[in-house]
């Protein structure tokens, strides 16, 4: 019954793939009270998720007893569809910053979101303007020109370095960071971990890139982050700072 509703809005093939991954998860770990509570949380929020794989509900579940509700979403898209922060902001009182360089989404973000929008591409260092490649309907866009994106256009956008974006943040100032830029997520994470800011929750896309995946995992684990529920979302990682959650596995 749980699997009948889980991601029920997704295509059947994708839904079965996700269910298979989740069954594998249940075979390899002991189902503790925490995991049972998470499943119940998903049931209560059925139909209210805007994320691709319920990432927003995971954040709400982990942060349900937190008083601080701040986010930064890097790679926002139109601000609503498959956004990891729209639900947090629109229905749960979260505040934050959005970083999205794709000019196709500027009007939509301004109309649908109250969070501050930085129209620039996040980079590891200050390099001025960068070439930005857009894919079909602008959904997939990247600083990298790769065969995985059917490029229709490219143009130059402003860049903003990690040091400038996170420079004023103290260690505990940011509750949630979402990073999905179809490119150098590993380099961004490594650079971020050199700074004082250590978000409580980090959701970062790896998109099955083995080198990128390894670099992300190593960097975050070295900084006391715990990887959770890996089999639920295969395309990205859900990390929580170890001092912000107590899971028994």
Residue map of PLM features:
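Phosphate/nucleotide-binding beta-alpha loop and adjacent structural elements of enzyme active sites
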Residues: 2-249
